[in-house]
UniProtKB/Swiss-Prot annotation:
The orientation of the G segment is defined as G+ and G-. G+ orientation provides S-U fibers whereas G- provides S'-U' fibers. S-U and S'-U' dont have the same host range (e.g. respectively E.coli and C.freundii). Component of the tail fiber that acts as a receptor binding protein. Binds to the primary receptor, thereby determining the host range. Two alternate tail fiber S and S' proteins are encoded extending the host range of the virus. It comes from the Viruses. It is found in: Virion; Host cytoplasm. This is Tail fiber protein S'. The keyword Iron-sulfur does not apply. Belongs to the caudovirales tail fiber protein family. The keyword Nucleus does not apply. Induction: Expressed in the late phase of the viral replicative cycle. Expression of late genes is activated by the viral late transcription activator C. Expressed alternatively with tail fiber protein S' (associated with tail fiber assembly protein U'). The switch from S-U to S'-U' is performed through inversion of a DNA segment called G by the phage invertase protein Gin. Keywords: Host cytoplasm, Host-virus interaction, Late protein, Viral attachment to host adhesion receptor, Viral attachment to host cell, Viral receptor tropism switching, Viral tail fiber protein, Viral tail protein, Virion, Virus entry into host cell. GO terms for biological process: adhesion receptor-mediated virion attachment to host cell; symbiont entry into host cell; viral tropism switching. GO terms for cellular component: host cell cytoplasm; virus tail, fiber. The gene is S'. It comes from Escherichia phage Mu (Bacteriophage Mu).
């Protein structure tokens, strides 16, 4: 009797049919025909590959192109999906539009959490890189829709420590020293002024009567200036210079006389001028003379009458020139 007849007689045909499509235990899942669909159906995370050429060459990528590639790999079919880029610079793209540094995907670990419409992507870069990629870094991209401020951020760590200002130079070089607005992000800006450039330190807390303050520093100790904002009106006053030991204020700056003005206005010396004398006894005597003082009375023969009277003018010096004093 044929085997098929025996199976039919025993009612085992359905069992045989199911067994022919069953997974084999000794295959340990290797015979699952649609692994991606299987992991999706059971809600499992997908470790896609430990050695994957991400993009296939070393050319630059935009974030949008990177997301399209992830979608083509089924990354959004699972609650969590990850892969690791192959360790070959020539076979992996470089993302250049993050705004916080280039991501070379060679050797990078890529993790995707969420759906195509509400995703979080995390990329961890290795300790060496190519294409200007940032090493030892963790980049995170969050996109819950275009209306919800999608974008990248890069975390600081022991290998990528945060500087005093997180981005070094903030933004691009501005056209002049008044171009940085009061409500701009705090940072250190480079500004063009008169064929050179100057450093603008900008601090903005966006609250209070003085919401922002700026310092302008010129090269080679060429001066420090500041200006402060008022409420929401911005910088109403121009730059004011901070005086230092090497940049002292002029007399005009503080409302004082210059040395030349002082020399032309102030008396620097007083003296008695040349001697004059006149016969007093049996002579004309001495009439009043403006600015003179009597300095001597001579009685040569020692009688009861003065023979001669002596006088000298009072003189004062202004700016090196002596003048006779007038009467009051």
């Amino acid at each position: 009797m044929p085997k098929s007849t025996i199976i039919q007689n025993l009612g085992l045909q359905e069992t045989v049919n199911q067994a022919s499509g069953a997974l084999q235990q000794n295959q340990n899942g290797a015979d699952i025909p649609g692994k991606d669909t299987f992991t999706k159906n059971i809600g499992a995370c997908r470790a896609y590959s430990a050695w994957l050429n991400i993009g296939g060459d070393s050319q630059v990528w935009t974030t949008a192109q990177f997301i399209s590639w992830l979608e083509s790999q089924g990354a959004f079919n699972h609650p969590y999906w990850m892969c690791k880029g192959s360790w070959a610079y020539a076979n992996n793209k470089v993302i250049t539009d993050t705004g916080c540094g280039n991501i070379c995907l060679a050797g990078a670990v890529v993790e995707v959490i969420g759906t195509r419409g509400a995703m979080t992507i995390r990329v961890t870069t290795p300790s060496t890189s190519s294409g200007g990629g940032i090493t030892n870094a963790q980049f995170t991209y969050i996109n819950h829709g275009d209306a919800y401020a999608p974008g990248w951020r890069r975390d600081y760590n022991t290998k990528n420590q945060q500087p005093a200002f997180a981005l070094g130079q903030t933004g691009s070089t501005v056209g002049n020293d008044k171009a940085v607005g009061w409500n701009w992000n705090s940072g250190v800006y480079n500004a063009n002024i008169g064929g050179a450039s100057t450093l603008i330190l900008h601090f903005n807390m966006n609250t209070g009567s003085c919401p922002a303050v700026q310092f302008r520093v010129n090269y080679r100790n060429g001066g420090i200036f500041y200006r402060s904002a008022r409420d929401g009106y911005g910088f109403e006053a121009d730059w004011s210079e901070i005086y230092t030991t090497t940049r002292k204020p002029s007399a005009g700056d503080v409302g004082a006389y210059t040395q030349a003005e002082c020399n032309s206005r102030f008396i620097t010396g007083i003296r008695l001028g040349g001697l004059s004398s006149v016969q007093t006894w049996n002579g004309p005597g001495w009439s009043d003379r403006s600015g003179y003082v009597v300095t001597g009375s001579v009685n040569g023969n020692r009688d009861e009458l003065i023979d001669t009277t002596q006088a000298r003018p009072i003189q004062y010096c202004i700016n090196g020139t002596w003048y006779n004093a007038g009467s009051i």
